[in-house]
Design a protein with these regions (language model features):
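Charged catalytic carboxylate motif
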Residues: 18, 68, 205
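Catalytic adenosine-cofactor/nucleotide-binding cores of aminoacyl-tRNA synthetases and other
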Residues: 14, 24-191, 251-292
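Basic, amphipathic alpha-helix used for nucleic-acid engagement in HTH/winged-helix/SANT-Myb modules
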Residues: 193-195
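C-terminal accessory/binding modules appended to enzymatic or scaffolding proteins
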Residues: 197-250
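Structured secondary-structure scaffolds
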Residues: 1-25
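N-terminal organelle transit peptides
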Residues: 246, 292-293
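Glycine- and acidic
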Residues: 1-6, 54, 209, 227-229, ...
Length: 293
């Protein structure tokens, strides 16, 4: 068979003398044996095929990419001189493999590290300009979660790419974008709770803010922050409650990303839509209050 080298798990080490004697009995030249350390669970127990969460299908359904999984299972055993903050493709791993750096002790799989590797993979795809696959996956995830409340027109490639660049340090799997923390990216808030926000004239503030945003030529985080500060001063409203109020109007969140971040990732057009939507809600509230009184 002309086999010169055998690499196998360390559990075969005790059987090696028997195998060598068999070769000797037949007068054959034995191959060179190397015994590799086992890959264990994070708690030190052995991996088992009876574990439901150890199958590749499980990880794929969870939204992990094959390159992230590949790096995840190669790191614990060694053999690769690469940093922890990079994800390499299979052909790249083949080129740098060095058996002399294989570890002697068993390695452990840390699920948190898989999340980090998956995040790094997403970041690499973005850095390499390979975003078509990512945006198409996000489109399917969001349409599946919010079908009936959102249309494909709301999920343009340009908008999804903008979101990916913004959230690449915030997520490790694309399906997280369908979670409650990121719902504001897809849906307008259906109610605005300003009961604990010190804003006495919400409708006037919103109308002023709409005009301010409409007149902005440059729409980046720095410019937005600067203009909102000026507008708060013009309206004689304290800056902190003013920004809390705008965050609530734009996202429905009491806490979360800054107003500058939210406006920038939504873009000027969607920001104006949200502010006008919030203005309608506030106007209806004021109308009901006048009627009741």
């Amino acid at each position: 068979m002309k086999i010169t080298h055998v690499l196998r798990g360390v559990e075969w080490q005790l059987s090696t003398p028997k195998h060598l004697m068999i070769y000797q009995a037949f007068g054959w030249t034995p191959p060179k044996y190397a015994h590799l350390p086992l890959i264990m669970n994070n708690d030190g127990t052995k991996l088992s095929k009876r574990q439901g969460d150890i199958h590749v299908e499980h990880f794929m359904k969870m939204g992990y990419y094959s390159d992230a999984l590949l790096n995840y299972i190669t790191l614990p055993g060694g053999g690769f001189t690469k940093g922890d903050n990079e994800v390499l493709k299979l052909d790249e791993l083949v080129k740098i493999f060095d058996i002399s750096t294989v570890k002697r002790s068993s390695g452990r799989l840390d699920p948190a590290h898989l999340d980090r590797l998956n995040q790094l993979f997403i970041q690499r795809k973005i850095a390499d300009g390979e975003m078509n696959e990512l945006t198409e996956q996000i489109r399917k995830i969001v349409m599946s979660k919010y079908s009936g409340n959102i249309s494909l027109d709301d999920l343009s490639t340009e908008y999804l790419e903008q979101i990916m660049c913004w959230c690449q340090n915030r997520i490790s799997r694309l399906d997280e974008l369908a979670g409650s923390d990121f719902e504001f990216l897809w849906l307008k808030p259906d109610k605005i709770d300003i009961s604990n926000i010190d804003i006495s004239n919400p409708l006037e503030v919103l109308q002023s803010c709409i005009e301010c945003v409409r007149n902005m030529d440059t729409f980046d985080e720095s410019s937005v922050g600067s203009e909102m500060k000026k507008n708060a001063k013009r309206m004689k409203v304290k800056f902190a409650p003013y920004m809390k109020f705008l965050r609530m109007c734009l996202s429905g969140l009491k806490e979360g990303p800054s107003v500058g971040e939210i406006m920038t990732v939504l873009g000027k057009s969607k920001t104006l839509e949200r502010l006008k939507h919030a203005s309608c809600i506030c106007e209806e509230k004021e109308s009901r209050t006048r009627t009741e009184s």
